Amino acid sequence: MLDNMQFHSPAPEHPQLNGGINKIPASHKIGYKLNQQVQRLAVVRNNIEERLNSMESSHGQISDSSVVRAIDASIDDFLIPSPPLSPKLRQCPIISQPQLVNVESDHRELIMLTPVWEAGLNSQKYNHNTRNFLSQYSFFRDMKTTKRIPNKENRKLKVVKSVVNSEALPKRRRYDRKIKRRSRELYEDDGNRSENYDEESAQEVPVRSVTPIRQVKRSLHTISSPLASQGVVNNVPKYIPSMSWEKLPDYSPPLHTLPNSNNKVLKVEWKGSPMDLNHDPLKQRLHPAELVLAQILRLPCDLYLDSKRRFFLEKVHRFKKGLPFRRTDAQKACRIDVNKASRLFAAFEKVGWLQDKHFEKYL
């Protein structure tokens, strides 16, 4: 490398020709280099001639483009050096590893690798130290906002937000609150970081005794139209089997207004099998069409008579006050299911029992 630096140094021609490099005249060095270049050019010329001769023997006549390609290929072979040979793995004898003889494996003796902690340091404290260290960076700033405190009752981690200012706590008038703070201090002693966890240091907030205010709850009354026959119905507010129907006044239309030949004039649609009222002691007080209606709606004869008298009692009192009698009024007056009361309203309306001409005599 020193020879090349001396040979290519920017010195004038006269010192280069007269001087010497490593005690060898520079002119001899230049002649040696020129001789190498001439030999290389001769090799290139021989390669070109060989390629042209081989092409003439194979193709006969050679075109100019073929000559140019042959010259380019020879020059490329001269200028582009061939890559170095890949290293070869020499043959060496394979040495087998020595086998341990008469060694019995005992699985009962196991080696347990555990992390080495400093005195007083565990995994929880290590995680706490790491979070405090990372919280100094803006990217991990939110890692210190919550604390994980074990709950002794269910042994689960409970996330509790740290309270900084006690004045920001909500004021409750009827309850006394006691707030406990858990303080954790991190300090560094003699270059070794350690953590000091205080026991549950409870700080009680001064409690203000406040006289509780009694709140009177107002009962919400349902908005509904009162019964026009409320004064009369108060004497018999509930249905009493075989008794209540006799205590109610009877404003029902006469039974002769119903045809005797048609027992299905009051028939309505109802799901379920009809009730057998052939042995009811009060069936003689019902028209045959009414008996069919009571069987379909599964109403005993005394309950049917009670509902019928309450039905027309409300109709008469509303007629006296000049109020219309609607389906909802019938449902409120009867002490039976609202769907059955609606079927009674439909049946009585179908035969004309709700017409005002039947009740004009009570005005």
Curated annotation (Swiss-Prot):
Domain of life per record: Eukaryota
Pfam families found in the cross-reference section: SWIRM
Record keywords, A-Z: Stress response
Signals that turn on the gene: By heat stress.
Example of a GO biological process term: ascospore formation
GO molecular function: chromatin binding; transcription coactivator activity
Annotated ranges, domain SWIRM: 266-363
Annotated segments matching region Disordered: 1-22, 186-208
Ranges annotated as biased composition (Basic and acidic residues): 186-196
GO cellular component labels: nucleus; Rpd3L-Expanded complex
Keyword hit for Acetylation: no
Record-linked InterPro entries: Homeodomain-like_sf, SWIRM, WH-like_DNA-bd_sf
Annotated protein name in UniProt: SWIRM domain-containing protein YOR338W
Species whose genome carries this gene: Saccharomyces cerevisiae (strain ATCC 204508 / S288c)
